[in-house]
């Protein structure tokens, strides 16, 4: 009969690496509700000092208050991300708080209209917030992160912007804006490599948000904002360089 193998006890204590997010300064746009609010809350719970940006001042202050009540650190900065001057003011305030470590671009609008009746105003607002706003914030974050040689960026697109996925009528402007976000993220990853800046894009399917309920009340969401926020935190807390430039589709969690 074989003798049992004796267990060797190590006198060296097991050491776990500290969370990357702990004590980092993180900026979340679209932080007044939905994915943005859930992400800001989750980042604060992970130890980050979170700057929350959105147009709705009252809702933004509500999310900020709940984060602080839970013991987190949060700074609200009302901002229209489609306005270049407003984004410049936002990043000036961020710079006053410290070195920016992470950016999550969750600001977005969703307006449904038949293609033949899509007005120029709807087209410009949708691309202005979803694509131009993401560009302006990523450009400013890139400039802030590059001198430090480190930075992590997460953008939010949609399955509607992913090639060969199911598309829905009335979302021409939205779909185009999300295709653009995916391409923008790839470009940031290419140029960010030499500066230690990584960028990934998440493309969730239907998420249970107020925005989606208004646009398509009949659609049954398979994801919650918390589902997306948890993945964002996990990504930011991990080395992003190996997957920088990737677009990660998120399907139903049901």
Q: Where are the regions a protein language model picked out?
A:
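Active-site helix of classical SDR
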Residues: 138, 174-177, 185
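Substrate-binding pocket helix/loop in short-chain dehydrogenase/reductase
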Residues: 114-115, 122-127
């Amino acid at each position: 009969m074989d003798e049992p193998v004796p267990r060797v006890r190590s006198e060296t204590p097991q050491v776990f690496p500290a969370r990357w997010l702990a004590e980092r300064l993180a900026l979340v746009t679209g932080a007044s509700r939905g994915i943005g609010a859930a992400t800001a809350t989750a980042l604060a719970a992970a130890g980050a000092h979170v700057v929350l940006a959105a147009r709705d001042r009252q809702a933004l202050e509500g999310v900020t208050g709940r984060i602080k009540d839970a013991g987190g650190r949060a700074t609200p900065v009302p901002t229209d991300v489609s306005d270049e001057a407003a984004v410049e003011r936002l990043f000036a305030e961020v710079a006053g708080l410290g070195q920016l470590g992470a950016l999550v671009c969750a600001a977005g609008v969703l307006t449904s209209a038949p293609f033949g009746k899509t007005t120029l105003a709807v087209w410009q607002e949708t691309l202005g917030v979803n694509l131009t706003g993401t560009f302006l914030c990523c450009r400013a974050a890139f400039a802030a992160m590059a001198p430090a040689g480190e930075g992590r960026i997460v953008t939010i697109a949609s399955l509607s912007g992913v090639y060969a996925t199911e598309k829905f009528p009335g979302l021409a402007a939205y779909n185009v804006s999300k295709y653009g976000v995916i391409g923008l993220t790839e470009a940031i990853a290419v140029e960010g490599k030499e500066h230690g800046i990584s960028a990934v894009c998440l493309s969730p399917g239907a998420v249970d948000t107020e925005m989606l309920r208004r646009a398509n009340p009949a659609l049954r969401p398979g994801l919650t904002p918390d589902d997306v926020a948890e993945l964002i935190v996990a990504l930011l807390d991990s080395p992003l360089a190996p997957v920088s430039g990737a677009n990660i589709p998120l399907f139903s969690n049901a």
